[in-house]
Amino acid sequence: MAFKPLHDRVLVRRVQSDEKTKGGLIIPDTAKEKPAEGEVVACGEGARKDSGELIAMSVKAGDRVLFGKWSGTEVTIDGAELLIMKESDILGILS
């Protein structure tokens, strides 16, 4: 199923966190902290000013981004766990 976010919403896939520590200990799922880093999967076209003028998005599909720990709404699309968030929830783009 294709999904296109509306307005200034962004669809993000979290990056996978490490399964082991540097010392070789396996980290159980209950002890893992969800990463605040992900890859943009899809973007809306942008927000609109009161005048109707479109404000272009700063991120695009494929960008690697950092976002707040509690940002976004978790959704499952085609079996993949993703986040939908506003562009303003994104803290920056990693290069």
UniProtKB/Swiss-Prot annotation:
Database matches in InterPro entries: Chaperonin_GroES, Chaperonin_GroES_sf, Chaprnonin_Cpn10_CS, GroES-like_sf
Entry coiled-coil feature ranges: none
GO MF annotation list: ATP binding; metal ion binding; protein folding chaperone; protein-folding chaperone binding; unfolded protein binding
Domain of life: Bacteria
Principal localisation: cytoplasm
Keyword Cytoplasm: yes
Keywords on record: Chaperone, Cytoplasm
Keyword Cytoplasm set for record: yes
GO CC terms, sorted: cytoplasm
Localization per Swiss-Prot or TrEMBL: Cytoplasm
Gene3D superfamilies reported in the protein's UniProt record: GroES chaperonin
GO BP annotations, alphabetical order: chaperone cofactor-dependent protein refolding
Function: Together with the chaperonin GroEL, plays an essential role in assisting protein folding. The GroEL-GroES system forms a nano-cage that allows encapsulation of the non-native substrate proteins and provides a physical environment optimized to promote and accelerate protein folding. GroES binds to the apical surface of the GroEL ring, thereby capping the opening of the GroEL channel.
Self-association and partners: Heptamer of 7 subunits arranged in a ring. Interacts with the chaperonin GroEL.
Annotated family: Belongs to the GroES chaperonin family.
Name this protein carries in UniProt: Co-chaperonin GroES
